[in-house]
């Protein structure tokens, strides 16, 4: 009987540093999604620091890593140490690496506190789906509640992102959360005396919204040496399974920075481009005192303009490949967007599309 999780399971997936083999982790995370998990996928060649930062900012229950590069013992132990140092030892670590991880190394890692390293023997006994269900069952933990951490955050962050992340989790799971800590309810001194702008970025799936967002973040950090930025990024949930691929971090090269916070949300509904928790997530980021907030929607159709309700300035990202010029008249956001970005401008017909728009 397939295991059905009682809670919304969120897992960070990646292939380890110096490892270009991403086939295995892509297979695993797709099965996780089919079982209803929300997967924050980072891609391959990811460092421990990047993975741990993402796991803490996203407030996940687990991290799943494939490692075929030979340095797995040090890699997994350092990940465990970094989580513990930052008061997030509750985040469980799972891994696999085929025959590159020896049985005695697996035993050593289990004793060190790694939740589970799956061996080729486990694959033969349990099968792919059996291993994934085991991961999801072990991660089926409720994270609601106050963000009371016993140790200070040691990552180089200008704000305690653990508290911010947990408050957004509460908002996702409970709607208007009654469990928000006093620090998260009380506006910071900066947020009381300034207007915090929200830029909404929307567009069709694959138009390059995340790449545009990353470029804005890069330029923001370069131009303002003392300002902070928060990103709330939404991806669609699958109607059939409830799972979601939250993959915007793959395109984000500038977010591993002390002045940047990013949170990925699933819509947890079909036929919508935004999560029901977007409004409170933005409020939480404002209360925390971020200077600038970007809201990135899931891919939208011609009629969707829902992002306008949540932002001060809206941007519609599109490509030159939209068909005949008459198709532009059907796109609702072109009537309302403050900015239109024609991305992938190296494509044929880009100058014509600029004229048509």
Which functions belong to the PLM regions below?
Residues 18, 25-131:
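Cofactor-cradling patches in redox/metallo enzymes
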Residues 169-177, 188-196, 207, 216-305, ...:
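Nucleotide-state-sensitive switch-loop elements of NTP-binding domains
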Residues 21, 32, 63, 109, ...:
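Residue-level signature of catalytic and energy-coupling elements of molecular machines
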Residues 14, 202-205:
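Residues at the beta-strand->loop junction immediately N-terminal to the Walker
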Residues 128-198:
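Extreme N-terminal, non-catalytic leader segments
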Residues 19, 204-207:
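ATP-binding Walker
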Residues 212:
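Hydrophobic positions on the alpha1 helix immediately C-terminal to the Walker A/P-loop
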Residues 85, 103, 110-158, 313-357:
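Conserved phosphate-handling catalytic cores of large alpha/beta enzymes
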